[in-house]
Amino acid sequence: MKIKTRQLLNFAAVATTLVVSVALRSVANDTPQAVPLVQKWSDASLIATDNDWSKVPGFVGYRGDKLTTKIGVNPQQIVSDGMNSAVSVFANQSKPNSFRSGGVAEFDGIPDPVVALKGSQTASAPFLLLNLNTKGKKNVGVGYTLRDLDGSVNNAVQPVAFQYRLGTNGNFIDIPTAYVADATTGPNLATQATPVVVMLPVEAWDQYHLQVRWITANAEGSDEWVGIDDIAVVADDIPAPPTAATAEPATNPKRSAEPLRSPRDASSH
């Protein structure tokens, strides 16, 4: 009887762990979003609870634990998956100058709300992920603004890279033209805004599930918060192929150039 009781207790503990695990992971809606898409983070109700992205379809922030073990790494070189790290967002923040934790944060207590990234020893390469559906689209372009939010004495070199991949597995591919070597200025400055526009390669067109991400890395010195704002994804429609009913019939120029003859005319020669 004691053995059965112990087995039941063990089973209950495992079941509880599974339930808690599922609950902790149910914090995001990673449904691929249709294009065009715009996100300016002006709606403060989208992120109301720490680590909960469920009201922001397609977007998920990750802390990027252990994606790199070195300080000052160029995030262009960090292309591994990273989605097994903790889902991250510090909700309802208002003091980017003094908020020291690293990862992803929502600053809705500032005049122009935004979601931002900041590296740290734990959050070695935090990133913001966006799931997209580009099926039926070509010439896919992404525009956004990197905003320096930290007006304190901090003056780190805070780089930001932009990457993509097809589907949800494998390494990301960096887009060098989108790289910003230092998205912040200082000390005691928080005015820099860096607009970026990038065209995705042809292989990113016409995809049911495409992932893009903004990623930074733990910098030398005290890292600074960098906002990822004014996100816009645009594209052109891929024209539908003509149907049989609308296709023009093929012609034979050589035959059409000759006048038609009746059987009688033909026999007279």
How should these model regions be labeled?
Residues 31-82:
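A long-range scaffold signal marking pre-active-site subdomains of enzyme folds
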Residues 140-142:
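C-terminal substrate/ligand-recognition segments
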Residues 33, 70, 120-122, 132-137, ...:
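Terminal, low-complexity interaction segments
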Residues 2-13:
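Bacterial N-terminal signal peptides that target proteins for export
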Residues 61-136:
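Surface-exposed, low-complexity/disordered Ser/Thr/Gly/Pro/Asn-rich loops and linkers
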Residues 26-44, 240-265, 269:
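Boundary/junction segments of secreted and surface-exposed precursor proteins
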Residues 160-162:
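Short beta-strand elements bearing conserved aromatic residues within extracellular beta-rich modules
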Residues 11-21:
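Bacterial N-terminal signal peptides
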